[in-house]
């Protein structure tokens, strides 16, 4: 028999060595142990989550508390007190910005810091109390205050405004604490309060003068003297929620500025009187219609002044009228009168004149204009 040759059928196949059963089971156990969570790691994760939740809760509670604390100072009465604090401090500009006075700009002349700085007394706050309608969007707040020791109350209307960031309360005071003061004048064209001035309306026979607005306080109204013949006589009033004045005339203004005339006017009256007396004591000056009738004659042959007034006395009923005693010595022919020389006693009266605005009328030389007459 021939020898058979065995030819290879293909590439040899590699065979992994067999793993013992004990080793295989051990590897499986290690893999399972690695993939399973350990008790310590899970506990740490739970603690971290708990801490985060706790912090968030603390922040939420703190935020709620902070909002409540903030809103506790954003109440209707707090808003009113803030407004009154500005007035008490004389901060008129900030008070006006906070609560609109509700008047035209040309009526706000005296609602300024400078005017309030001039006040002898300003607002003192005693108490501020809101009503109990806590859920209402419109609240009533009553403030008790003083000016110069005089107590008064004022009720404010406060309305709820749009909240800030949706959570912080806002309130708006609707009515400003301003008071109307009526002013009239006789003999003055202007007056000042503090560093502000205004035209002084002429005093009327009846009714009140022009109206101006003021914040509470004690103010001095100082008239501006139009000439050297007029003194400036100030008037001081207490402005609360109404004006506390000394006059009781219901038709009178709160402030009446009445001109007072000084010695310069008396001197001017004497000077003017002396000139007219000298004129009447001359011929033909004696025939001037203002001269005493007894010396207005062409039968007068001589005239002189026997007694010249040295002082012109103001009339009690009219401080702008003056009088003085004059004696002329006149000599007559027998044309109309009994011939001879005799004294003519008379009273010189000078009335100062006023223009249409009630101001002292002056001539082109700046001297007072007088109407001259003789009583007899």
Residue map of PLM features:
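Short solvent-exposed beta->alpha transition segments
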Residues: 92-151, 287-315
């Amino acid at each position: 028999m021939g020898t058979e040759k065995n030819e290879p059928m293909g590439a040899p196949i590699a065979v992994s060595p067999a793993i013992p059963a004990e080793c295989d089971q051990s590897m499986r156990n290690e893999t399972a142990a690695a993939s399973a969570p350990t008790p310590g790691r899970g506990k740490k994760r739970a603690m971290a989550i708990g801490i985060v939740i706790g912090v968030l809760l603390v922040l939420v509670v703190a935020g709620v508390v902070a909002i409540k604390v903030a809103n506790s100072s954003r109440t209707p009465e707090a808003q009113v007190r803030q407004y009154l604090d500005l007035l008490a401090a004389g901060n008129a500009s900030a008070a006006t910005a906070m609560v609109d006075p509700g008047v035209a700009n040309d009526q706000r002349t005296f609602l300024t810091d400078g005017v309030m700085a001039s006040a002898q007394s300003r607002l003192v706050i005693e108490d501020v109390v809101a009503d109990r309608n806590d859920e209402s969007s419109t609240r009533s707040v009553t403030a008790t205050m003083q000016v110069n020791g005089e107590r008064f109350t004022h009720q404010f209307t406060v309305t709820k405004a749009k909240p800030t960031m949706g959570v912080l309360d806002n309130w708006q005071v609707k009515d400003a604490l301003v008071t109307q003061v009526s002013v009239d004048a006789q003999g003055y064209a202007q007056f000042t309060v503090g560093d502000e001035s205004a035209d002084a309306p002429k005093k009327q026979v009846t009714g009140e003068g022009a109206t101006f607005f003021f914040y509470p306080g004690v103010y001095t109204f100082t008239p501006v003297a139009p000439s050297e013949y007029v003194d400036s006589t100030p008037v001081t009033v207490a402005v609360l929620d109404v004006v506390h004045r000394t006059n009781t005339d219901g038709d009178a203004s709160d402030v009446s500025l009445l001109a007072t005339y000084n010695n310069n006017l008396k001197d001017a009256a004497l000077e003017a009187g002396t000139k007219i007396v000298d004129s009447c004591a001359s011929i033909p000056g004696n025939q001037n219609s203002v001269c005493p009738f007894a010396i207005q004659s062409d039968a007068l042959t001589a005239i002189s002044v026997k007694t010249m007034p040295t002082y012109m006395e103001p009339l009690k009923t009219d401080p702008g009228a003056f009088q003085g005693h004059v004696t002329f010595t006149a000599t007559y022919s027998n044309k109309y009168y009994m011939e001879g020389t005799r004294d003519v006693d008379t009273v010189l009266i000078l009335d100062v004149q006023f223009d249409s605005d009630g101001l002292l009328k002056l001539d082109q030389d700046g001297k007072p204009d007088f109407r001259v007459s003789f009583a007899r």
